[in-house]
Every structure is written in C-alpha cells, then in structure tokens.
Amino acid sequence: MSSAVGASVLLLVAREAKQRNGGQFTDAHGEMLASLPPEDLRLVQAASELMARDLVVKVTAPSGRSFFRVESLNKYRRKEQDADVSVDSVTQPFDESMVSGNGANYYNCFSHYCTCAAFHDTVVTTHPLAMCKHMMARLLADATGRYQTMQVEDIHLAQMLCPPPTVEGDDRLFSPGR
C-alpha cells in the first residue's frame, strides 16, 4: 500500500468482509478498492494471486498461538514453468524443512511484519508501501477464510518462528546462560 490511507481502506474492507459478510466482498467493497492508486491495486492483484493459488497457510499450535505462512511464487518461476501448486508440504507431518521462515519457499506473515526482503526494503527502509503482497495475501485470506491450515506442536511453532542457528558457533548466541 502506498499510503496509510490505502492501508486503512484495505483493512476496513477486509474487516467488514470477515465480520459482516461471511468472507464475501460486496460491490461497495469493490468501489472502495477501486479508489486506491494503481500501485496499490497491483499489490492487491498480486496478493489475490497468492490466495487463489492456495499459497496462504495458517499455522496453529495447541496453545492457540498462530501465524500465517505464505509460500513464494518465485520458486515456481525459477523453474521457468508454471508448475501446479502442491499443498503436500501442508499435509505432511512436521519436518526440518518447514523450520525456515524466509528464503525461497515461505515467508512468515503477521499483521505488522513479514519476513520477505520486499517488506524490509519497501516498508521498513524506504516507506513507499505500508505492507507487502504477502501481508496483503494474509489479510485477504483471513477475511475470506480461504487459506490452508497446518496444526503443529508448540515446540515446532517456536522453531518455525525462530529457527535454530545454522552456522557452527552461532549456538552461543542462543544459549540460556547469556
């Protein structure tokens, strides 16, 4: 979103669609979204594509804590083919490949933060946008209920949010004695 006003419009539309309309967008919502600048509409379109391909996953633990994980389209484009999106990673048991929260496969998304580089570059550093396409996809998916679900144990949720160090010697940074 190119402005706080644009972000506010999208948040209002998503909240209304979720609470009042059972996840359905109305013509009035369309009119509100149509008032957004073209760059914001491109982000909405990119986020809608992520949601339409079922790349948004809500990860929930028994404690009730949850977050959204959005799969990257880049891994499919790098293969220079339009591959079918598989949700095997969502339905399979937890494994170590699911720990990484950023990079080529997944981005961990919250209402206020995303682990993608675009969030850091365009939202945090230069401020032309109020959110990235992954955060917008999370918002749209939550409003419409159109997302995959993944149940994990609390320890696995913690590992997904804060992966253990991968470089030898970095473990001292996370030792309980520090």
What do the predicted segments below correspond to?
Residues 1-178:
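Long, low-complexity, compositionally biased intrinsically disordered regions
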